[in-house]
Amino acid sequence: MMKKTCIFLSFLLMVIFSVSCNAKSTENIIRMDGSRLEAILNDETERGKYLVIDVREDYEYKAGHVPYSINISVQEIESRISEISDWKEKNVIVICRSGRRSRTAAEILVKHGFKKIFDADGVSKYNYKLEK
């Protein structure tokens, strides 16, 4: 009986630890719907408070992207962190096509100490006014 209790408590501690580690990596990532992103982009004062990173591939970005965004693909984001490190304490919005790559990019940014990450609806999920 004592052995089963020890095993159970050990398992419980591992679960609690893994959940708390996972929560830390995502607590700084906030979902943002497309209408909120468009409102920010259309307001000159608000727009200056955010860095918008399109994490799609270059050819996807060139085909059409939200205004005022920069392109750093999800594959490159870790190696190009130094280019955006001034934004660690500021608002960073990541966007892609469907939300999968932007979520990955957001997690990478949190891992590198970024505090305020917004994961916006992808360009296939919201009817953004794209520019080329």
Where are these regions (language model features)?
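Sec-dependent N-terminal signal peptides
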Residues: 6-12
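Structural scaffold elements adjacent to functional motifs in cytosolic proteins
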Residues: 52-54
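Rhodanese-like catalytic fold shared by cysteine-dependent sulfurtransferases
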Residues: 3-6, 17-40, 50, 59-90, ...
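A solvent-exposed beta-alpha-beta segment
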Residues: 44
